[in-house]
Amino acid sequence: MDMHCKADPFSAMHPGHGGVNQLGGVFVNGRPLPDVVRQRIVELAHQGVRPCDISRQLRVSHGCVSKILGRYYETGSIKPGVIGGSKPKVATPKVVDKIAEYKRQNPTMFAWEIRDRLLAEGICDNDTVPSVSSINRIIRTKVQQPFHPTPDGAGTGVTAPGHTIVPSTASPPVSSASNDPVGSYSINGILGIPRSNGEKRKRDEVEVYTDPAHIRGGGGLHLVWTLRDVSEGSVPNGDSQSGVDSLRKHLRADTFTQQQLEALDRVFERPSYPDVFQASEHIKSEQGNEYSLPALTPGLDEVKSSLSASTNPELGSNVSGTQTYPVVTGRDMASTTLPGYPPHVPPTGQGSYPTSTLAGMVPGSEFSGNPYSHPQYTAYNEAWRFSNPALLSSPYYYSAAPRGSAPAAAAAAYDRH
């Protein structure tokens, strides 16, 4: 309402407490602007004069001019608002019914189009036509009122007198919860799509495909699970007895034979995770079969053939190319000496190698006739000072058995490599 800061050039027409605004215009407190000034403001606006220029010419505050022009553009009226009390209600039952009728005929009609049509058909005039916001509120609260079905599923709504509810034709009716208690909150239940008996989803449905030939022959049982809409707790679990019982209830006797049902029971009673002790025993049995004598024989034959085919110039004539090595098993393999590698000295108390064995490995001019022995590799300053890394990888230097001191000539011979 424009009751404050109103410039009134004709203040004599409105006796009362008045004043002068910042533009020099005279106004009266609590009284609206005269209709003559209001009409002049609208005329200047139609002529294209800016609101700020209108305010200076008529010496009316800019806020007053903007409010009068805004109301005129919205309602087409230049009359002031009612002083005191509330303005008369424009959303009469007749107007609400017309708005509902327009919305029913054209659901996509905008509020400003409804307002123009109310004015064009003479339902309302410029003073009683509802605003755009009022029309939107009427459509939201009264015309498109949410549909609340009764508990008995009749779907009849009770409306206030004078108000009309527009039935929505765009969406199909939603089936009540009493007709479909399970699927009322599903997608089909929300959208109201009817479901036939053939398309009805089966809960806890399990399809088990078995091969009778494998069952009779003792082979593995092939199971293919197809779970459709399985709720929590109904999944078959090998550790849960309830899962076995619930699954057994769904398996019909006319579908599977007694032998197949017993095979299924054995599968379900078996734990889901293998036993630790059974797994270790299984691994030990596999390792025993892998390193048995029949399994090692082909590999040793390949080593013998490769050694016999190649010649090593470092060995000289002491090692012949046609030597054969017997196949040994168990602990005897530890005493077997292969050409090109230093011999393995057994621990104390297990015997030593004869001199002839050492003489066949290295030229005899570098060693004495005594049995060969060598100290631990820690007796030297650093192990990496050997130029030949093959010596460091030999099992001889990493043996845990204690050894006696070696002659200085033997150490010097290995240092020259």
Curated annotation (Swiss-Prot):
Expressed in primitive cells of the kidney, ureter, eye, ear and central nervous system. The modification Phosphothreonine is found at T226. It comes from the Eukaryota. Changing P80L: In FSGS7; decreased DNA-binding capability and transactivation ability. Residues 305-325 have a biased composition (Polar residues). Residues 19-75 are annotated as: PAI subdomain. Gene3D superfamilies: Winged helix-like DNA-binding domain superfamily/Winged helix DNA-binding domain. Residues 94-142 are annotated as: RED subdomain. Changing G24E: Found in a patient with non-syndromic renal hypodysplasia; likely pathogenic. Changing S387N: Found in a patient with bilateral optic nerve colobomas; uncertain significance. Pfam families: PAX (PF00292), Pax2_C (PF12403). Residues 16-142 bind DNA. It is found in: Nucleus. Residues 304-325 are annotated as: Disordered. GO terms for biological process: axonogenesis; brain morphogenesis; branching involved in ureteric bud morphogenesis; camera-type eye development; cell fate determination; cellular response to glucose stimulus; cellular response to retinoic acid; cochlea development. One of its GO terms (molecular function) is DNA binding. Transcription factor that may have a role in kidney cell differentiation. Has a critical role in the development of the urogenital tract, the eyes, and the CNS. It is linked to Papillorenal syndrome: An autosomal dominant disorder characterized by both ocular and renal anomalies, but may also include vesicoureteral reflux, high frequency hearing loss, central nervous system anomalies, and/or genital anomalies. Eye anomalies in this disorder consist of a wide and sometimes excavated dysplastic optic disk with the emergence of the retinal vessels from the periphery of the disk, designated optic nerve coloboma or 'morning glory' anomaly. Interacts with ELGN3; the interaction targets PAX2 for destruction. Interacts with TLE4. This is Paired box protein Pax-2. It comes from Homo sapiens (Human). The gene is PAX2.
